[in-house]
Every structure is written in C-alpha cells, then in structure tokens.
Amino acid sequence: MTSAWSSEIQHEGLKQWIQEVAELVTPDDIRICNGSDSEYAEVYGIMEKSGVAIPLNPDVHPNCFLVRSSPEDVARVEQFTFICTTKKEDAGPTNNWRDPQEMRQELQGLFRGCMRGRTLYVIPFCMGPLNSPFSLIGVELTDSPYVVCSMKIMTRMGAEVLKSLGTTGSFHKCLHSVGAPLSPGEKDVAWPCNPKNMRIVHFQDDSSVMSFGSGYGGNALLGKKSVALRLASYIARSQGWLAEHMLIIGVTNPEGQKKYFAASFPSACGKTNLAMLMPKIPGWEVECIGDDIAWIRPGPDGRLYAVNPEFGFFGVAPGTSETTNPNALATCKTNSVFTNVALTPDGNVWWEGLTSQPPEGLIDWRGNPWQPGGAPAAHPNSRFTAPVKQCPVLDPQWNSPEGVPIEAIIFGGRRSETIPLVYEALSWQHGVTIGASMSSATTAAIVGEQGKLRHDPFAMLPFCGYNMAHYFDHWLSFASNTSLKLPKIYGVNWFRKDKDGNFIWPGFSDNLRVIEWIFRRTNGEESIAKKTPIGYLPEESSLNLEGLNLSSQALQDLLSVDVSGWLKEVANVREYCKIFGSDLPQTITDELFRIERELK
C-alpha cells in the first residue's frame, strides 16, 4: 500500500500513521488531498457519478451542488458522541464518558476493513490562519468524498498545510469512516452510512478523534466541532485561553469608532443572522469575522483577542431569506454545497422561509415530488456550506493571525418568557453565571425533541471537551489575573413572546438596536442603564426605537425584571447545577444567592 502516496509525505510520523490506518481499514486506494480547485472538481465529479451530488443551475448557482443524505443521517448525534478521559470525573456529568482503552478496542473492531472498496482520502487541514500562534493543524483520514469537498470549504486544507507541518510538526489525528465497506462488484448507495454503529469519539490523552458511521456535517467534518471545540476547549484550559461556540463581529458607529464583539447562542438561535446583520439604522456598519466558533486568548496589552478558526460557513438553510439574512444568501450564491434542501424544476434550491410561497414542482430533500401541506420540502436542519471569503460583509481583519480585541461578550438563547431583551452583567463573575445559566428551546440541529427547554451553559453543552464545572472555573480564573482588561458581558433574548404567543421583538436587522446600546455601554455611558439584581437594564428612553411600532406594554415586557419569573429561574438553575455536585464553583452558588436575595 505504500506506493505513490508515500512520496508526497515528508513527515515520518504522519506517514507511519497513514500506513497503520490503511492496514486496519484496507482501502482500495489512498489519495493525499492537495486542496486545489481541480481536485475539488474531480472529487465532486465522483459524487455526481455516484448519484449523491446534483449540479445546480450554473446561471443561478455557479459551481454549486445539492447533496441528499440518508434520512437516518441528518444531524449531530449527541447520544453517540463520547469524551474519553482516564478519569470519568474529568469528562463530567454533561458528557458521555467511556474508558479510552475500552473504546479504542471497540473502535478497532468497527474500523477493521471498513474502507474496503473505497478510497482513503488524506486531508491535512489547519484551524485558524496558517502560521498564527492560535492555529491547530489536523489530518483527517476519511472515505467520504463529501467530507473532502466540505473540508475544502470549511478549513484551510491541502498542500499548504502539509508544508506548514514540515517533517516534525505536531498534528491532531482525525479518523473518519462512513462505515460501509463494499464487496467486489457490490453497487454503492448514494449516501453510505451505518446508523446502528455511529460513534464520534474524542480521546483527550492524545488529542485525537475517531468518527464512525455518519457522513453528516459535525459528525464527519472533524475540524469543526470535534477539533475546534471539543479538543480545543481541553487544550485551551491547560494553556490559558478559550475555545468557544461564538460568532465574532466588528461593529462601527456613525462616528467611525469600531469595536469587536463575540456572541454565544445555541444552534439555530440566530448566530449566522447576527454575524451577517444588515443594519437598518443609518451610519452603522456590522462586519463578520465568523458565525460559529471563536478562539480567544489574552493579548500582550491585556485585552482578549479572538480568531475564527474556520474558513467557511455551515449555515442552517430554513428561515434564511432576503428579509432575514440577505448576506448569507449572497455568500452561498457560488462555490457552495447545499445539503438536504429542496430542488426546483429549473435546478435551483428552495427551503421553508426562502420565499413566502413554494415554487411548483419541487423535489423534496428525500428526492420525491413534494406536495404542499405535508412534511417540509427541506429538512429542518438542511444546510449550506459556503466559503468565508464570499461573505459580502467580511471584516478586513478576518484572517488576522493575531485576532481582534473583544470588548463585549454576549450570551443568548431562545426564551419566550422571563429573560429580558438585554442586560449587562454586574461583574465578570456575574457574567460567567449568566453564561452558566443559559437555557434555550431546542431546535432541529440536534436529534431529539424540538421545542423543549434545555440547559445549555455557554451554548457549549454538546461541545465542551471536559467537565463543565471545571470549564466554569476556567472562565472565572480570568478575573484573578489583574493584568487582563476583560470585556463586559451581556445577556440577550430576541425571542420573548406576548400573552397571545407572538414574538414581541422584531429581531433580525433590528437587533442592531440592542448592539447599539451595548456599544454605548462599552464606551462608559452610565445614564443609559439602571442597576437591578439581574444586571444593568436599559433605561426605556435609551434604546433607539425609531420606526418600530412597540407599545409601552411590549417595552415593559422586554425591559423589566419579572421578579416571580426570575425567582423560578434561579431555582431552576440551582436545581440543574446539582448535577455538578461539589465541582460547581462556589462563586456561581454565591451569585445565584445574591440575585435571589436582592430580588426578594
């Protein structure tokens, strides 16, 4: 098996690992990916030939294609996602823990011969700008052409990364297989997967990932959630930085002053919409650095600096439209992959929310003619994968190796009651408690029940690679470093409803009105806020509401402290935090008692 491919690899450790894996998984061929456009076209051609990829109308979506996954492989599978640490308590109560030795043995059995009849693709990738002190290099071995094309969009990958790795550089080993070997002469299915044996496994002892059975997004594109969050969060704790499920935006006011904010929301709560927000208020500008992941490190001047480790967007399609997010539509106009959306007769894509009326003659995400009134035409978790460079509001500093200085951190979720539109933490410790207390109505990004309220601290519940209580502690530790100039922390909630069940706040581009208030607060404007037990709330007159038709009752609902609701909220958070036992930092317990005491 060590023939043509081995001469392309100068790194002996990498060469040896590829050889070991090849002996285990027995592929028909091995291919080192160079990341070129011609390679992308060739691999896409393989998918088109196999029937998994459908080219879109080049007049509407040049160099774009639609992929339909198996209905059994459509979202992240948290129940099959594992953190392996020597001691169970290091993984904590919010992760699925397995003994690393036992799990490695189990995976050896699953991976044995799993690439028979397939090509093993070697994907060298870099999370973060090449040659940045922030960056991590990984190598993903996969048998999925879909993963090759998606990783080309989502990461910096190929020959450049291999060169940067040199002959001795360290890298994260990421092994992936769809888990569907082919016998000689056996015809392949369009989307091979192995739903009964799915495993997405993270080994913190050697910072590696093994993923089996799923070809979908976060389960298979191992640079994304696996390396950039689950492994990176563990590394960040030991090295004094943060790996977070956050967007990063640059905001410029009419006077030309610019600030960078990071914001954390659970999946499908409007991260991409906020990251690409198009302001309605004259003179304001919002530019995007990233919509999903932020790596944040203390800089030489004591401020916290953030980079987006990704190279593309993996956005939820349903609900994205010219009204809600015109910049996202412009971003995925060309060179993009659409997964599990509907197809129009003229070779265009469609999903719920794209237009008010569906076009006639749609083919749904399963490949069947679609009838209005039945199941959705596009899967609720259907996606677009698009290069970050195509974003029309991309910030000039998007590729800065040093990152950008963060002046505000924002936490949000999907809450219909109690949580106000915006509030500012009274201290860093209080801000960490706001992050730890986050909960949200669940969405289609995870397999399971939709619409239930689930606790999702820091929107990191599925992504924190170690004990969440130790993670809270790590966040709190930043306050004890007196040389740091820490950003202010805010909570926001775009999803409050009135008694009739209607959203009170218009959301989308109007969220800039809240960002404007936060901007002014970071400039030290005292008179625009009032102090309450839950934090600083806007004075009603301080929010720019020009052009909005909000009643005084609506404004009161959005900006007041619902005492009984908050007492229930504190009790709920305290009850949830019992899962952490004695590991829960005392600071969080104290903050919850303070809020309760002051409310009473």
UniProtKB/Swiss-Prot annotation:
Metabolic or biological pathway, per its Swiss-Prot or TrEMBL entry: Carbohydrate biosynthesis; gluconeogenesis
Q: Which residues are listed for Mn(2+) binding in this entry? A: 225, 245, 292
Q: Where does substrate bind?
A: 76, 216-218, 267, 381-383
- Report the record's Gene Ontology biological process terms: cellular response to glucose stimulus; gluconeogenesis; glycerol biosynthetic process from pyruvate; oxaloacetate metabolic process; propionate catabolic process; response to lipid; response to starvation
User: EC number(s)?
Assistant: 4.1.1.32
Gene Ontology cellular component terms for the protein in this record: cytosol
The cross-references to NCBIfam families, in alphabetical order and at most eight, read: PRK04210.1
UniProt-recorded name of the protein:
Phosphoenolpyruvate carboxykinase [GTP]
Organism from which the protein derives: Chlamydia caviae (strain ATCC VR-813 / DSM 19441 / 03DC25 / GPIC) (Chlamydophila caviae)
